[in-house]
């Protein structure tokens, strides 16, 4: 391809068996991408795994809902910024340089967290805390005024959000580009190579998550947050070096213009021309007579007097068909992002066992370790799916389309939210009978006498949902997109994922209002024992259930349209 740079090393190899030929000559490039992604994910989960605990504890003392909202907003930013990252790569820098720049920005933002964790540097960034009088929030003032503020003060909020924004922008750009960049390394080997790359790419993501949750989260909770946040910083530094050294084996191409720019120009032109045509048509009869299935965009084509080529207009039309699928995935992501926010908050109020009593310092099981059940399940099932299940289904013509797999994932994530709601209902009943005071990360939590292991089902259900919905979503976004818009489509896929995170944060803020009161506990900031978190979980399950029904309609319609366009059975498409 013109303008595309092939690898300097390993470009010529002798003939190999069909099973290994898909990656022959590309193993070094794919390995560098997968290793960089593994390290980046280890750093990402090192930030997010215990962020709620970090902000909820001394000396920050954020309210539990505030800490959860901060994490949801951060994760939303990492996804919402993806289209910008895709535009930056396509229009200005190219994917390889955009990834390098984003890793450097990522590293800069991560430096804020060990600085916030160290007392001396924290005082420099945030100033010394102001002493405040302790008030009895349960007793009203004699004059009838409110005795407590509606929300707890958030210490170090500017420095915290500045670090989160920098990391979020870095993550967003990496996220938008490293997936299609990795697929570019094997795209000339056919769809089978692309499918297998996505499977192992997702496997690497979850291996990084396990290493982070297993080691870094333990260090943060039981040793120190300074060391626990220093390790992710080192991981990103190594990822930067790995990607920098891999330039000699990567297949790269220079920026050739952004599909987003063309997309917005075509959308703007079509809307303006349609509005002008409606004004000229008097009562609108002419527009109705001219209308056809794609008349809105066909008017942009050069053959119809417009300024755009046929290919660009057809690419935008393909994009418009894909967007409803992304919209339908928003509730899925809303539930998915509860795993490290409200699920983690629920964990802190369940009985967490001690795992070490060798020394005088007792170590407790990191609450974030439950997230590993999700990651371990994925690590075990993806190779099984890749090597055994998918080949058998393909030989018998039973491999479901990516949209059908997404629907299955939606069902399992709905079950996860429902299971969390049932557990929270039981927890609230038990905490009224017996309360256990447990210290986690220097913070005393009033927990129910109910083991944390009861959360395993909701994490396992989310893990199963990922195998279906997340992997199939990535595959759908890449394979359904026109070649000229693959980065743009991938960016939009993550953009709508970010909207799901913001929806979760917005819902959490809404139910925290005193008028609703599901998550308001103004007599004890950070304590959810006076809240109704189970209502929130049931609400999420209901929203996902309703969306699943709508998605089934959308997916069946899309598969039928794709089958008519491609001339093949719908079950074998995307």
From Swiss-Prot:
UniProt cross-references to SUPFAM superfamilies, sorted A to Z: MFS general substrate transporter
Subunit field text: Interacts with TASL; leading to TASL recruitment to endolysosome.
Entry keywords, A to Z: Endosome, Immunity, Innate immunity, Lysosome, Membrane, Peptide transport, Phosphoprotein, Protein transport, Symport, Transmembrane, Transmembrane helix, Transport
Protein function: Proton-coupled amino-acid transporter that mediates the transmembrane transport of L-histidine and some di- and tripeptides from inside the lysosome to the cytosol, and plays a key role in innate immune response. Able to transport a variety of di- and tripeptides, including carnosine and some peptidoglycans. Transporter activity is pH-dependent and maximized in the acidic lysosomal environment.
PANTHER family noted in UniProt: OLIGOPEPTIDE TRANSPORTER-RELATED (PTHR11654)
Modification sites for Phosphoserine: 281, 299
Subcellular localization, as worded in the UniProt entry: Lysosome membrane; Endosome membrane; Early endosome membrane
Family: Belongs to the major facilitator superfamily. Proton-dependent oligopeptide transporter (POT/PTR) (TC 2.A.17) family.
Protein name according to UniProt: Solute carrier family 15 member 4
Pfam families reported in the protein's UniProt record: PTR2
Membrane topology (UniProt): Multi-pass membrane protein
Consequence of gene loss (knockout): Mice are fertile and look healthy but display impaired cytokine production in dendritic cells. Reduced uptake of L-histidine in brain.
Organism whose genome encodes this protein: Mus musculus (Mouse)
Transmembrane stretches, start-end: 42-62, 69-89, 98-118, 161-181, 197-217, 225-245, 319-339, 364-384, 406-426, 460-480, 491-511, 536-556
Tissue specificity comment: Preferentially expressed in immune tissues, including B-cells and dendritic cells. Highly expressed in macrophages.
